A protein has these predicted regions:
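N-terminal active-site segment of His-dependent metallophosphoesterases
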Residues: 1-55, 68
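Active-site-proximal beta-strand elements of phosphoester/diester hydrolases
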Residues: 2-10, 118-124, 243-244
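Residue-level marker for buried hydrophobic side chains located in beta-strands
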Residues: 5, 34, 61-62, 119, ...
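Divalent metal-coordination and catalytic microenvironments
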Residues: 8, 37, 64-65, 104, ...
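Active-site environment of divalent metal-dependent phosphoester hydrolases
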Residues: 12-14, 40-43, 66-72, 128, ...
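A general structural motif
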Residues: 27-30, 56-58, 120, 222
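Active-site neighborhood of divalent metal-dependent phosphoester bond hydrolases
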Residues: 46-49, 54-173
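Acidic, His/Gly-rich catalytic cores of divalent-metal-dependent hydrolytic chemistry
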Residues: 135-283
């Protein structure tokens, strides 16, 4: 049985199909971990969601910021939903949208496999978090999203404050800080305060900011973390962190990382020729 983590798909359905073919993926034996941002910008978000939803127990998903945004948009009135981009509109008005949204709300913010020794998140971990703290923060959000109270969280999801997670935070502010960390973080300062504007490669950040995994004094965790979200970082391996957002939606590659082997193995497919490589990166 093989276990692969897959970077940000963002609706790049043809590339996902080609990648699964290249992996010779067998749903009866193999497992796929998706780092999040399943939807938006690639053109075929609905097909992507249907494919991954159909994998059932063969797929594990950690939600990304685009996935959470889609869930929040789904709570708007229909006239507001009709004003979003055509790709997301197709998802919102699909006959099976309620099933797909309920499934998305049941997914994770963090996944840890003790036997494999791997942890997966979409973006990153707060410098002060232990693994157990990170799991607790993720589980708080997961419980809320899968409960009848999910609308309260999704309606208060967005905002850059608090910019840093703290054990003193409570309620919605605590969950928003955790979500910002798990799904939006790239650069932060020594106190874990996130720079929400910095989206370039390491070395382009503002003074006093660091890639989240290079913060001085960071709690070094005896684990390996696989994450996406940061296409300007690209394929990265260092300090126990493996970045696999290789910018497929921008004309780069879609990347899988095999996890169940002593030396992690990268497998990639090129983006479809029509995808345009853009300078910089979106959220």
């Amino acid at each position: 049985m093989a276990t692969y983590a897959i970077g940000d798909v963002q609706g790049c359905y043809p590339e996902l199909q080609r990648l699964l073919e290249k992996l010779r993926f067998d749903p009866a034996q193999d497992r796929l971990w998706f780092c999040g941002d399943l939807v938006n910008r690639g053109g075929q978000s609905l097909d992507t969601l249907r494919l991954i939803h159909g994998l059932r127990e063969s797929a594990i998903v950690t939600l990304g910021n685009h996935d959470l945004s889609l869930l929040a948009i789904a709570l708007r009135k229909q006239d507001a939903q009709a004003r979003v981009n055509p790709e997301l509109r197709e998802v919102l008005f699909a006959d099976d949208a309620p099933v797909l949204f309920e499934w998305l709300r049941s997914q994770k913010l963090l996944h840890h496999d003790e036997a494999l020794g791997w942890t997966m998140v979409h973006a990153g971990l707060a410098p002060i978090w232990t693994l157990r703290q990170a799991q607790r923060c993720a589980q708080e959000i997961e419980r809320e999203l899968s409960s009848p109270r999910y609308t309260r969280l999704l309606k208060n999801l967005f905002g850059n404050r608090p910019a840093a997670w703290s054990s003193r935070l409570q309620g919605i502010e605590r969950m928003r800080a955790s979500i910002n960390t798990l799904t939006r973080m790239r650069f932060c300062d020594v106190n874990g305060r996130i720079d929400f504007e910095g989206k370039g490669a390491p070395g382009t950040q503002k003074p006093g900011m660091y890639p989240w995994f290079e913060v001085p004094g960071i709690r070094r965790r005896e684990m390996r973390v696989v994450c996406g979200h940061w296409s300007a970082l690209g394929r990265f391996a260092g300090l126990g962190v493996y970045g696999i957002d290789t910018g497929c939606v921008w004309g780069g590659k879609l990347t899988a990382l095999r996890l169940d082997v002593e030396e992690p193995q990268y497998i990639t497919v090129d983006a479809e020729p029509h995808r345009k490589r853009l300078a910089g990166e979106g959220d």
